Structures are given as C-alpha cells and as structure tokens.
Amino acid sequence: VSSTPSQHLTQLQHYADDLQQRRTNRRQLLKAAGAGAGIAALGALPAELSASPGSPIGAADVVLAQGLAAGTALVTSPRLPLPGIGAAQVAPLLQGDYANWHEVGAPLSLPVTLVVLDGYLPEGTSPTSTVGDYEALVDALDEDAGAFAMLPIELIDCRVNTLDIDGVNPLIAAATEDAPAVRLGIAGDVIFGRNGGNRQRDFGDYSMPMYQVKDFMASFDVTVSNFECFVSETIDLATVDNLDFVTIPDSLKGLVLAGFDAVTMANNHAVFSYAGYGIPGMQDTMMHLNEAGITPFGVGMDLDEARVPWVTEVNGVSIAFYGVDGVTANLDYPDSAGVQNMGDNPSAATASQGGTNPLKMDQCLADIEELVGQYDIVLPYFHMGEQYVWTPMQWVVDVSRQCIDAGATAVLTAHPHATMGMEIYRGKPIYYSIGNFVYDQMFTLETREGYFLEMTFVGKDLKGFRIHPVDILDFFQPRFMSGLQSAGYNDRFWRSVDLTRKTRGWDRELTRP
C-alpha cells in the first residue's frame, strides 16, 4: 500500500507500463503468427493472444476446420450462450451427428437446427430449412436459439454470433491490413465507495477487485467503463449507509491493472453529492484518473470541455466515446422516470460552470453527427434510465434510437444497476443497461450481476458482440460466470430483450440496416 502521493504515482505508472508492454507483445506475436504460418499459427497461440488484431491473410483464404469451405465460418443465434467449438466438432455438427448443443459444450440443452442460405449448402448435410437471403437468415436465427448456419465471413454482421474454432475468432483471423480487427471491452458501473472501498482497505490490496477478471480484460485493445465515485485525498470517506461515494487514489490500481483506458464521468456521482463535494470533488477525481493514465470524459470545467469525446486509434481505426449525463443533467426530460430533477442546481456544465455533459438532444445529436464525420467508430455512453427494472423507459428508447439515426455505431447505457436487454435498430445495437461491474449492492440477484461487453470490429464495421456475465463477490470483486449460472443470466438477458420488444414499439423492419 503506498504511503505517499509520489509512491502512489510510481506504482500506478509501473502498472500502466507493464500493461502497455503486455499489449504490445501480444500484437507483435499475432502479427508474426499470421505472417509466418497463417491461421494454424494463430490457433497455436494462447487464448488471450488470439484476441486481436488478426491475420493478414484475408477472409476468402481462411480455412478454419475440416468441413468448412474456405472463407466461411459458423454462425449461431446470438441467444445461444456458446462462444465456440473445437475444430474436430465442426464436420460432425454440420453432418447432424450432434442433436443437442450441450454435446458440444453449451451450458444448456437445446436442439441443433441447421439453416442453409441459398448457395451455401455444406457438403453432406441435411438442413432443417433453407432461406433465400441474409436478412431471412438473421430472422431465422433470432427466432430459434438453436439454429446455426455456415456463411461467408464477409457477409457476417453483429446480428449473428460467430463461433470461435479452437479458440480462434474467424472475424479476427480474416482481418487484413486494410480492414484490421479491433476489440473493445465495455464495463458498466464501477463504484469504489462505501463497502467496496472498505473491503480494499481491509485487505490492504487495492488491486484486489480486478484479480479474477484482469487477464481477460487486459487482452482488449480498448477498455472503457462508467465510473461514479469521488476520488480524493482531502474528502472524508463516507459511511456505509451514505449515498455519497468517495475513495482514495490507491483504489484506481485495479483499473490500471485490468487495462482500463478511459471512463465516462457523465453521471449522477461526478458532481452531485448530498455533502456538497461539487466541482472541487469532480476536479479531484479527474486529476487522479488522469494521473493513473485513465482518461475521464463527459465532464469538464465548462460545457465545451464536457462535450469533448475521448478519442483513440487502434490499428488505424479511429474511435470516439461520448459521455452524456441523463440523470442529474437531463435538460430535455427533467420529470421523467429515472431522472433526478435538480431544479435550479443541475450538475450540467454550462459556458461558465463546470459539470457533466447534459442530455440536451439537439446538442447531443449535433455532436454525434459531427463525430461521425470525423471518426470511424462513434459510441455515445449514456447514464440514464429508471433503476432496478427489467426494461427501458420509452424516453430512453427514443433517445437511443435518435442517436443511431444520427449515425452512432452503437449506444451504451449504464445507471439502472440491473441488467436490461438490448435491441438492434437500423442494423445497430443499443445496450439499455450493462449493469453493475463493481458495486456493493449485495441485496438482490439483479444488483449483484452485470456483464462485460465484447465488441469486435473489422475496420469500422461492428461484426460481432458477446456478453460476458459477471457476478460481484463480497461487495467489490467481479468474476466471470460459467456453466449453468451463465446460462441463467443469458436467459434473463434475452427475456428482457423480448419484453422490451413487446412494450416499446418493436417491429422487425426496424432491425434492418
């Protein structure tokens, strides 16, 4: 445990340097493997090393397993909680030797259904059904959680799940120098106040929250979360029954260790507090995050600064994250469910006052449209919605869809402290609540759980996503679920998707690009 600010900064810098070296080494190994021996060499790498940025051999030349034509991959319903299978299982699966997905590793019992897209009939197979175009295939996979198909890799988009083969993601394996792979990792609410911070201090280990997830998270090219907690050496720590969240700079060590690059502070605990920490508390937090090498966005000392996105570049692909506070700075829906009406004292930044980037739709949409013209990937990360419910409010749906109409690549949301589902709108995903990642709400199953979102891009195109369910142990330590626990979470996630469709004006035509 560091005893002085200088020791603290030295330790954080050591963590940051070590992480950067690990990422650099991984990318170099992947590049060498792809150039030297193609996909076979990639398959020989450790799993965490096969996770970016891919082989330069091109989609048409990739041969993943016996039974798969060159340039093709297996895709399933996104509802199937199965990331991949072994190469030796591919041909038997296509030929109907497996009747149930649990036979190839799925954590549940679900009949296998082969759907064939016209022109792509695997040799020696007997499909359950045939569809005429890709849109019909997407519909078939959405309607049947056990359905799968063989597809050319270049046809695949984020509306289907692409199976890894022997730990190799076909989308990444087929990436090229002109269309490189980029993996983004998105976490939900991270809060080190109250019991979470107390547990760190009890153990005397400020990296402990991330020990069970750090290796996987550090494998991503970019990792971002919502961070809502004051970080200060001058503010007194709040008691466990307090709704003000305060921690010390040492608490950031775990985020650095796990590879967090940036965090949105556009939320209801960046400026507002019952004790009145206000702008000085926000400044402390921003300072300590920046010192740790984690860039805060969605806040600033005036409105212009609060509207500035966090921008990064990976393999030549530019990415902009844009934070918006729809809870304590909601100027367009001040009286709606899930909004703290701040009256004459909002947290919103203005031309002359610091604060969070407010939810003011004409301003937000103009910003998104401008960012779309400048960057390849644009991801608004909202803090909004009613807490502890399964489905989004209608105003949240309206806000999210307008952002997609403005050109956003996807929409991310935190704040409800319970997982909600997602929807595909105009071919792009909206994630209505990613849920808790580090928070001391042990009182319900929903608040103890969340997910880590994996997004795989090829160039600027989102080709796939996966949700990795997490549960929170002992008030402060996330771990990834597995087996039946993961299957149960997956079931609740998709039930929320279906309930949202029934209650929020869903139509299948709205899903089309």
Where do the model's predicted regions map?
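Short acidic, glycine-rich surface-loop motifs adjacent to enzyme active sites
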Residues: 220-232, 263-270, 368-391
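N-terminal secretory signal peptides
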Residues: 1-28, 35-42, 47-50
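Active-site-proximal segments of metal-dependent phosphoesterases and phosphodiesterases across multiple
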Residues: 235-256, 376-407
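C-terminal segment of N-terminal export signals and the immediately downstream linker at the start
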Residues: 23, 44-69
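Conserved beta-sheet core of the metallophosphoesterase superfamily
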Residues: 259-262, 392-451
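A short C-terminal boundary segment appended to hydrolase-like catalytic domains
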Residues: 198, 446-513
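Binuclear metal-dependent hydrolase catalytic cores centered on His/Asp/Glu-rich metal-binding motifs
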Residues: 197-211, 245-246, 313-378, 484
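Flexible loop/hinge segments at secondary-structure junctions
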Residues: 62-177
